[in-house]
Regions:
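A short beta-loop-alpha structural element at the N-terminal edge
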Residues: 2-17, 176-178, 194-205
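Conserved GNAT acetyl-CoA-binding A-motif
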Residues: 113-130, 135-136, 140-145, 276-287
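C-terminal "cap" of GNAT-fold acetyltransferases
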Residues: 150-164, 170-189, 289-292, 309-318
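Conserved active-site alpha-helix within GNAT-family acetyltransferase domains
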Residues: 130-165, 266, 290-309
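A short, internal acetyl-CoA/4′-phosphopantetheine-binding micro-motif in the GNAT/acyltransferase core
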Residues: 81-82, 88-100, 125-129, 252-260
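Conserved GNAT-fold acetyl-CoA-binding loop/helix
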Residues: 23-40, 191-205
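A short helix-loop-beta-strand connector motif used in the catalytic cores of GNAT acetyltransferases and
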Residues: 41-58, 63, 74, 209-220, ...
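Conserved acetyl-CoA-binding loop-helix of GNAT-fold acetyltransferases
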Residues: 98-114, 255, 261-274, 278, ...
Length: 318
């Protein structure tokens, strides 16, 4: 019978071992190592070891669950807000065949969140729901992607516990070795750029830092003093280290309201693809929320990039 204890540093090797055992062979699997767990979880703002419960039996660590209240903050803790009426479960890791352990870990997290005042709980939320300081880069994508649709046993337990799908996502991937395709997109970008440039716009690339990702590059289109379109991109370091392939991530596209409908979303994406290729990227992927039809159509139709993996967030109202 497993006992649950708050995370302690001596748990770390066993926690990593069970993670790698459970996720091996899954979508975009990258073996977890201590330095990545520290960078992506334990050293992140808001990490609370009391909210990472580790399951141990006589043989050692057999699973864990990590949970907490919804938080929203971007570049500094001074901006942080906490909403205890909504909880989130960032990770539940246990052998899929051990249904009783999975249920026990889930029950423990739900009970703790409910006792803290949660009236709704998200399971594997992505950035659509709230700020995600944890597991970016180590959970199957450059960003925290959600729960893989391949985890059938866990999805079955969640359904039995009243969790229902709240959001669906995809990670489309663009292979930059397809130079003919990239060249065709660059020709389309040049046509859009000529129209925008005639209106006095300029473009720039700069570096940006945040609490959640390694330094990234931002591609911007600027009109006067206003940034009218932008997107950020950077190398997915854990994936490159594990697979020897330089897969980059793109983290969202923003177009100013008064400039929408002019092709700037497509333009800024193509400029980011080109900039990543110039840096030596082999491929680029990004995280798309299916409820955002504008973005879904941009990535899957205008750019012709097809989903490679599918993910979802679930929710339960208490």
């Amino acid at each position: 019978m497993a006992t649950f204890n708050a995370f302690r540093w001596e748990h770390l090797p066993g926690l990593i071992a069970v993670w790698n055992s459970v996720f091996a062979g899954g979508p975009n699997f990258t073996p977890l190592v201590e330095q990545d767990f520290l960078a992506r979880v334990a050293d992140q703002p808001s990490f609370d070891p009391e909210r990472l419960l580790v399951a141990c039996d006589a043989g050692g660590i057999v699973g864990f669950v990590h949970f907490g209240p919804v938080t929203n903050f971007w570049y500094s803790l001074s901006e942080r807000t906490i909403n205890p009426s909504e909880g989130q479960i960032w990770a539940l890791v246990a052998p899929p065949s051990d249904r009783d352990l999975v249920k026990a870990l889930l029950d423990a997290a739900v009970e703790r969140l409910a006792s803290d005042g949660a009236r709704k709980i998200f399971f594997h939320p992505s950035w659509v729901q709230c700020t995600q300081p944890f597991y970016n880069g180590i959970a199957g994508a450059y960003e925290m992607p959600g729960l893989s649709d391949t985890r059938a046993e866990l999805l079955d337990v969640l359904a039995d516990h009243g969790f229902t799908p709240a959001a669906h996502y995809a990670t489309p991937e663009f292979d930059l070795s397809d130079r003919a395709r990239l060249s065709s997109l660059m020709e389309a970008a040049e046509r859009i750029w000529q129209r925008v440039e005639s209106a006095g716009a300029t473009r720039a690339v700069r570096q940006v830092r945040s609490a959640f990702f390694p330094p990234r590059r931002v591609v911007e289109i600027i009109s006067g003093l206003e940034t009218i379109a932008m997107t950020a991109f950077g190398p997915w370091e854990e994936y490159a280290r594990a697979h020897g392939r330089r897969l980059y991530g793109i983290t969202g596209v923003q177009v100013a309201r008064g400039w929408r409908g002019m092709g700037l979303g497509k333009l800024i994406m193509i400029l980011a693809l080109d900039a990543a290729a110039e840096e030596g990227a082999d491929a680029v992927h990004l995280h798309v929320y299916k409820g955002n039809e504008r973005a879904w159509n941009l990535y899957h139709r205008a750019l012709g990039v097809q989903p490679k993996h599918l993910w979802l967030t679930l929710e339960r109202r208490l």
